[in-house]
Amino acid sequence: VFISIPSEGADNLPYEKNGKETRCIVDEIPFEIPDSWEWVCLEQICIYIQRGKSPKYSPIKKYPVIAQKCNQWTGFSIEKAQFIAPETISSYSEERFMQDRDLLWNSTGLGTLGRMAIYRTELNPYGIAVADSHVTVIRPCSLVLPEFLFYYFANPTVQTVIEEQSDGSTKQKLSCIG
């Protein structure tokens, strides 16, 4: 996400320092925040940000795959999940297994791009779940409330930025934010 730690220049405008480069980011700050807050990079407040991977599907209902259809503005729902082939579960590293209160962010699809929900383990009777390649998992550090990030990303101003940053001929994929 664009959000970065700015510093103020002599002109009282916000600047971002990235390595050796410093640039004015006044046009990128979506809205004013209280003086006691600061803009930060999403990577600075999360321990994991990763798109899911393409699964090998199976009719065996053992390990659900969280897809965009499981991720609605009304919340997370396991009922629409498909399942991965049980023999492929070992190809997933432990951090790819969903954890309670992970943010599920639809990262492709016209009309679904940017949609977000919060994963709840109590809504998954199967125990283990993984995300497919159209869902990005955002796992905030313990000091950050996932609900705060959810409401930030759900904000119409931020959703507009996400739509404007979409990529490809059909504007169906988020290349980057920021």
Feature locations, PLM:
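Extended, domain-scale alpha-helical bundle/helix-rich regions
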Residues: V1-T22
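Short beta-strand/loop turn elements enriched in aromatics
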Residues: Y57-S77
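Non-catalytic DNA-recognition/assembly elements of restriction-modification systems
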Residues: R23-G52
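A short beta-sheet element
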Residues: A67, I89, S93-A154, G168
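Active-site/binding-pocket entry motifs
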Residues: N71-Q72, L110, Q159
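Short, basic/aromatic beta-hairpin or loop at an interaction surface
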Residues: C70-I84, G127-A129
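Specificity-determining recognition surfaces
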Residues: Y152-G178
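Amphipathic alpha-helical segments
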Residues: W37-E38, L149, G178
